[in-house]
Amino acid sequence: MKTRFLTQVLSLLLIPGSSLVVAADTSTPSIPKDHVRIECKIKPIDRNSHHRTHPHIPFGEMRIPLGYSTNWSGYVAETNLTNPAANSVSAISASWIVPTIKASTNSTYCAIWVGIDGYSNSTVEQIGTEHDCINKKVQSYAWFEMYPGGSYEINGFPLKAGDVISASVTYTAKNVFTMILSNNTQKVSTTIPTSYTKSTTAKRQSAEWIIEAPYMNSILPLANFGTVYLANCKATINGVSGFINNNAWSNSGIEMITNSNTPKDIPTTLASNGAFAAAWKHQ
């Protein structure tokens, strides 16, 4: 299983095989030179008529190395999982493959993102992609959010099932974050204007790589995405850059479950290049 998983991730995300055993680039993400920079229209998401993402909702006591949540799955990294240091996380990035969503009779939803904060506090600075099935029709779009501030759709950013997406959030200075989203298959990238990415409340305590069941008054049904693959999951914490499982900090997997303990989404163990997969189990 692990060999098959790594083969799929490395081939589909176009990651050199040597990165599995040799230290890879963990520098601050930038737009690839062969990408076309596109300016996308930033469209506010109406909170009263549209779902949104939400900070981590834990279930039961926190457990290490695997915690439980009713709306998140994936991985989190902090200086310390029980008492994380503020102002410690300055960057996060990852790549993932846009999943093929299976149609369902009811409306279902799925968000894939990277972000800073939200696991141990109530702010989140995040960017990612959304994949829903509404009235039996699959819809995908890119978005970002500075929770509890506004949520925004990134209109004009291309997304198709099978595309390889890269995303990053980097703290620059003076409460400003830089957010970059790239479609490596279609070779386009966009940078979110910094007028949208300021936060005076961000604690910068945690880095997260997440598959989420979005929220609108309550947690929404999780779309059947099959398996989501993420790789090159990197962070910079206390000035040290590395993959999720760097020894300079602590990390934990997160399994998404229902209130009755039924697994909804289970992440695999980490590969040495920060790769993991998440398998859908239940709405």
Predicted regions and their residues:
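Bacterial N-terminal signal peptides that target proteins for export
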Residues: K2-V9
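Bacterial N-terminal signal peptides
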Residues: V9-G17
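Sec/Tat signal peptide C-region and signal peptidase I cleavage site
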Residues: S19-A23
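Exposed, interaction-prone regions of secreted/extracellular proteins
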Residues: A24-Q283
